[in-house]
């Protein structure tokens, strides 16, 4: 590969800025399609006399959703002994009775083991914990990369990670995919995946920078470093995306948002690791203190001045 990354870096900055603004616009205007985990709802546990077909139950619930608003967002869990656990949005007593009667007519007789209202406490608590995890993770990343590399690498990596998270969340908001607890897990997974790619590239940049000792322009050092790891990064991401695509196709509706979130996040994570984080390092390098003068009067060229 012979990518001229630094020559077109402004294009990537403009694209990323546009995507961030678009994501913020979607989040503040369209909001999120919150699932039962965050809004609360009703839970029905039923033990059917005969085995229940997942396909038949899904079809029945889809048809019933046009009549009963609480079924527009639902989750079904199947367990041994013909037991089905159905979670829906909040419904009044009249709607609950109608749903239970129609299920009996469509799927056969059952024993109603439990019918309760559930709150959104768990989902809200998880969302709060996820925000704390994101904040703490960003701080730890800053500390770790500052120690292992230097502050310009640390700041660049955190900015790239926040970009990945924001754009992914904006995508979910724009297309109004249901936000549930697995969505939070997907966001945290994206952080780890993107960080791994970024560190691999940064390590190669640092290695080459030390090797040339300032004799080669830093922009060329970045281009050379990215070209050496480009194929590895892309192939790793493609392998993961193929596995996620299979899960999206065959995994059913329960994991739909989780899989879509990971797909989008990994695509943007790969993009940001290569086309955003590295140019950010180049941009931030000009804020470093100028190199000290050596005793013999010669200037230390270990750090080349970067002109943007």
Curated annotation (Swiss-Prot):
Annotated InterPro entries: SecD/SecF_arch_bac, SecD/SecF_bac, SecD/SecF_CS, SecD_SecF_C, SecD_SecF_C_bact, SecF_bac
Entry keyword set: Cell inner membrane, Cell membrane, Membrane, Protein transport, Translocation, Transmembrane, Transmembrane helix, Transport
Membrane topology reported for the UniProt record: Multi-pass membrane protein
UniProt key word Transferase: no
GO cellular component terms attached to this protein's record: plasma membrane
GO molecular function, one term: protein-transporting ATPase activity
Superkingdom field: Bacteria
Gene3D superfamilies: Multidrug efflux transporter AcrB transmembrane domain
Compartments where found: Cell inner membrane
Transmembrane region(s): 12-32, 127-147, 152-172, 182-202, 234-254, 262-282
Bridged cysteine pairs (disulfide): none
UniProt record, GO biological process: intracellular protein transmembrane transport; protein targeting; protein transport by the Sec complex
Subunit (UniProt): Forms a complex with SecD. Part of the essential Sec protein translocation apparatus which comprises SecA, SecYEG and auxiliary proteins SecDF. Other proteins may also be involved.
Family: Belongs to the SecD/SecF family. SecF subfamily.
Protein name in the entry: Protein translocase subunit SecF
Organism this protein belongs to: Sebaldella termitidis (strain ATCC 33386 / NCTC 11300)
Gene that specifies this protein: secF
